[in-house]
């Protein structure tokens, strides 16, 4: 079950799997010399399982629950070691938003103010409909801003990686913090420019 990684925890077993395992052990004790015909054996196990009461199955259900706890615990211990490189660094540059996300950030407060008590799901639905109804030209300012932020993000990542190698995490954290402030200032300036453009359109 742990193909390619011997340290990976053994998969969790179902109640039926424990039942089959028990049947196999019983068969070995009673007929140690007789090899198991798996096709026939599986069929018999399946038929027997179907005729068992919930009370009879309870023992195997408990075994499956205990094995699930074991599996979850082992996977929790195994996960960080395997995915350690993928662990999020709080000092890393923040991933840039998409054009749609920028549009949502602008119009979400407006929808909430005009529709008091509206659910989060309905807000998302309305935003999706509004975005889909925009022409490519109307989407352009948001997509352009997203492209700029993406470009900046890629530069920040390159700086962050090089800083992390030479100056350590502390230097990277300082750099990331400074970049974040600059990015927020830039966003505010662009927001003001867009609002001015909107006013001109009106």
Swiss-Prot record:
Q: What InterPro entries does this protein map onto?
A: HMG_box_dom (IPR009071), HMG_box_dom_sf (IPR036910), HMG_boxA_CS (IPR017967), HMGB (IPR050342)
User: Which residues, as ranges, make up the DNA-binding region of this protein?
Assistant: 9-79, 93-161
Q: Which residues carry this modification: Cysteine sulfonic acid (-SO3H)?
A: 23, 45, 104
SMART domains associated with the record: HMG
What is the annotated localization of this protein?
A: Nucleus; Chromosome; Cytoplasm
Spell out the post-translational modification annotation for this entry. Reduction/oxidation of cysteine residues Cys-23, Cys-45 and Cys-104 and a possible intramolecular disulfide bond involving Cys-23 and Cys-45 give rise to different redox forms with specific functional activities in various cellular compartments: 1- fully reduced HMGB3 (HMGB3C23hC45hC104h), 2- disulfide HMGB3 (HMGB3C23-C45C104h) and 3- sulfonyl HMGB3 (HMGB3C23soC45soC104so).
Annotated Gene Ontology cellular components are: chromosome; cytoplasm; nucleus
Where composition is biased (Acidic residues), the residues are 183-202
Q: Where is this region: Disordered?
A: 71-98, 161-202
Q: Which residues cross the membrane?
A: none
* One GO-annotated biological process of the protein: DNA geometric change
The source's superkingdom equals Eukaryota
A GO MF label: DNA binding, bending
| Entries under PANTHER family matching the protein | HIGH MOBILITY GROUP PROTEIN B3, HIGH MOBILITY GROUP PROTEIN DSP1
Record family assignment: Belongs to the HMGB family.
The protein's name is: High mobility group protein B3
The protein's organism comes out as Gallus gallus
